Amino acid sequence: MKNLFEAATVSEIQERMAHLRPDSERQWGKMNVAQMLAHNSAWMEMAAGLNSPPRALIGRIFGRVAKKKVLGSEQPIGRNMPSEKSLIVSDEREFVAERERLLQWTNAFAAAGPSGCTTHPHCFFGPMTPLEWARMAYKHLDHHLRQFGV
């Protein structure tokens, strides 16, 4: 399974990001493209331990099973999945700045490797190994890039 510790996977994600435009239209969801980029940077900050949303009750109940389903399959994350409230971006953002910020985060995450991952549990899935964080980072980015057709 692809993960963001692999240089080829990081390159693939960044090439896809290069195809985004300020007017790229979403195929589902509520965020515009700049908000999506900011949301993904906030997710990467969570993976690095810079923010640690508390575990949601529903995640405590279903998180372990859901993690196995998501990470145990090459299947992409489905459309319209709920987001952690603290990672939702609803204010206006500047596209070029947000794309650059996310490019920097993908590079930093890959360069830091396993030691750069948080030890805090994911807010829904619970405890995750660095490799699980790297796989989920890929799947999360892939999900949102597909949301905007790239």
Language-model segments: what does each one mean?
Residues 49-101:
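Short, helix-capping/interhelical loops that line the mouth of catalytic, cofactor-
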Residues 24-71, 119-150:
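Short, contiguous alpha-helical
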Residues 14, 18, 44-45, 103-110, ...:
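Structural signal for well-ordered, non-membrane alpha-helices
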Residues 10-15, 79, 113-120:
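Short alpha-helical hairpin
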Residues 10, 14, 37, 99, ...:
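Short, amphipathic alpha-helical "lid/cap" segments that border enzyme active or binding sites
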Residues 1-22, 39-41, 48:
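Alpha-helical bundle segments that constitute or directly flank the non-heme di-iron/ferroxidase center
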Residues 88-136, 140-141:
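A charged, amphipathic interaction segment
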Residues 1-7, 17-18, 28, 82-95, ...:
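Globin-like tetrapyrrole-binding proteins
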